[in-house]
């Protein structure tokens, strides 16, 4: 119970602190400016799949040791272009056995990963970084090796019964930080 309350509180604080934050990546700014789609539709009518965007998604490679594939993590910037809030109710991939949202917290000087339960609230007009050492997606029990240079698909499911398929790049470091350098 206390863990659930703590995680909910952390999610609220993170969402509020990220809501006004602009990204430091100039490449993301140019991508995000192109994200606003169907702006002539009412916020109440626009499905989550059209309003919510997973910008510059990437995941770390796995390591295969004696046939056992290590877990991985996925990062991106989550953007909701509308005033309306949506809820993420599940994430899946045919390449990954289990997928969870995690938040890194500092507990008495020790960083710990905490699972964030569904449904995950995506507030209106929000721009949230899922990045190393912070909020991220854990990829458990990959069914295949994820090697640098590979791509795979992941599906996000929303409470309005829509879904969004996202192509994820596999890289040792954020491949989008290298664009234009």
From Swiss-Prot:
UniProt cross-references to Pfam families, sorted A to Z: PCuAC
InterPro entries xrefs: PCuAC, PCuAC_sf
Bilayer-spanning residue ranges: none
Protein name (Swiss-Prot/TrEMBL): Uncharacterized protein RP573
Species assigned in the record: Rickettsia prowazekii (strain Madrid E)
Upper taxonomic lineage: Bacteria, Pseudomonadati, Pseudomonadota, Alphaproteobacteria, Rickettsiales
């Amino acid at each position: 119970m206390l863990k659930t309350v703590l995680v909910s509180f952390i999610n609220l604080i993170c969402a509020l602190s990220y809501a006004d934050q602009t990204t430091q990546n100039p490449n993301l700014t140019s991508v995000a400016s192109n994200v606003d789609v169907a702006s002539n539709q009412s916020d109440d009518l626009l499905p989550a799949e059209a309003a919510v965007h997973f910008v510059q998604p990437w995941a770390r490679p796995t390591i295969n040791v004696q046939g056992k594939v290590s877990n991985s993590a996925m990062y991106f910037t989550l953007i909701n272009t509308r005033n309306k809030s949506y809820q993420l109710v599940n994430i899946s991939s045919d390449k990954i056995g289990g997928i969870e949202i995690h938040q890194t917290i500092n507990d008495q000087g020790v960083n710990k990963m905490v699972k964030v339960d569904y449904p995950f609230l995506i507030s209106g007009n929000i721009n949230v970084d899922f990045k190393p050492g912070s909020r991220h997606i854990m990829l458990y029990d990959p069914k295949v090796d994820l090697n640098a240079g590979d791509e795979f698909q992941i599906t996000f499911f929303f409470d309005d019964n829509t879904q969004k398929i996202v192509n994820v790049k596999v890289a040792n470091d954020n491949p989008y930080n290298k664009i234009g350098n």
